[in-house]
């Protein structure tokens, strides 16, 4: 995959801002025996190129001032909320130096496996890209992984897939054979049996006679008698 870049003379925050306002993206290419070079690219062309997987994972042919160099995309800085590429970095590729890259994994065939087709399991993709080292001429655009042989209760590990010629995986974290794909059995929902409804309580039979009237409220007690008058003293 090839693209065109242009030499950039001015650098700095102000120069980069003016460059972006004119529809360009500032960048740099470094590595190899040559000195780092400031470049600029057409933003719209770069934006569409970045949507392609091959632009991120394969050796690119970059043309600058009539000269073509083989490079790898190493870093992209995006605006936090605008569709804008702020800066981009490329590294020159030496044909005699091994590369360390992340290569996408392309999975296929899971729908034809017994795990999915017969046992109705779910396929969980644990790893979507693989760290590898290889010579530039051996770098694959992607690694195809066949899942048509998956069975219930199994997993697919790194040693189960066939890597392209000259490609060596980079193992991290002490895992010599990490899992790439796991098979998740279907979830069976057991419905609890519905208990028989309890019979409704029988209403009490109504009395034949009329309901007794409530007892009459007692009248308040008579007021206490007045004390007797004192006898008059005799003269």
Curated annotation (Swiss-Prot):
Pfam families: Ribosomal_L25p (PF01386), Ribosomal_TL5_C (PF14693). Transmembrane segments: none annotated. Keywords: Ribonucleoprotein, Ribosomal protein, RNA-binding, rRNA-binding. GO terms for cellular component: cytosolic large ribosomal subunit. InterPro entries: Rbsml_bL25/Gln-tRNA_synth_N (IPR020056), Ribosomal_bL25/Gln-tRNA_synth (IPR011035), Ribosomal_bL25_b-dom (IPR020057), Ribosomal_bL25_C (IPR037121), Ribosomal_bL25_long (IPR001021), Ribosomal_bL25_short (IPR020055), Ribosomal_L25_dom (IPR029751), Ribosomal_uL5_bac-type (IPR020930). GO terms for molecular function: 5S rRNA binding; structural constituent of ribosome. Residues 201-235 are annotated as: Disordered. Residues 212-228 have a biased composition (Low complexity). It comes from the Bacteria. One of its GO terms (biological process) is translation. The keyword RNA-binding applies. Belongs to the bacterial ribosomal protein bL25 family. CTC subfamily. Part of the 50S ribosomal subunit; part of the 5S rRNA/L5/L18/L25 subcomplex. Contacts the 5S rRNA. Binds to the 5S rRNA independently of L5 and L18. This is one of the proteins that binds to the 5S RNA in the ribosome where it forms part of the central protuberance. This is Large ribosomal subunit protein bL25.
